Amino acid sequence: MTRVKRGFIARRRRNKILTFASGFQGSHSKQFRVAKQQKKRALISAERDRMKRKRDFRRLWIARINAAVRFSGLSYSQFVYCMYKNRLSQNRKNLAQIATLCTPFFSTFSQKIMT
């Protein structure tokens, strides 16, 4: 059987993974086997945390809207129900920005929705 010299291809594959892991600490950035495992873990964590970030921001927006709506004597769920009843659709991100930046406008808006 003939000898297969695949140094370039193998080296390119290893260098690609080691370059990805270059910011990791200790042997996680130096040794190929460890770096390969850490790259796998890093990509899994990155995907998980991207999904978690969406949940966290939604919770933050709801908390901000709820805090602003409480001044009008409503709860968040009542506010959303009033918006649904009046056929108003606005996403939570925009509502939270309005609630934090334009508080007087948001309070009059929530009062109008209530009636």
Swiss-Prot record:
InterPro entries linked: Ribosomal_bL20, RIBOSOMAL_L20_CS, Ribosomal_protein_bL20_C
GO molecular function per UniProt: rRNA binding; structural constituent of ribosome
A Pfam family the protein falls into: Ribosomal_L20
Keywords, comma-separated and alphabetical: Chloroplast, Plastid, Ribonucleoprotein, Ribosomal protein, RNA-binding, rRNA-binding
Disulfide bridges in this chain: none
Domain of life where this protein originates: Eukaryota
Gene3D superfamilies: 6.10.160.10, Ribosomal protein L20
GO cellular component: chloroplast; ribonucleoprotein complex; ribosome
Annotated localization: Plastid, Chloroplast
SUPFAM superfamilies registered for this protein in UniProt: Ribosomal protein L20
GO term, biological process aspect, one: ribosomal large subunit assembly
CDD domains: Ribosomal_L20
Biological function: Binds directly to 23S ribosomal RNA and is necessary for the in vitro assembly process of the 50S ribosomal subunit. It is not involved in the protein synthesizing functions of that subunit.
Similarity section: Belongs to the bacterial ribosomal protein bL20 family.
Protein known as: Large ribosomal subunit protein bL20c
Higher taxonomy: Eukaryota, Viridiplantae, Streptophyta, Embryophyta, Tracheophyta
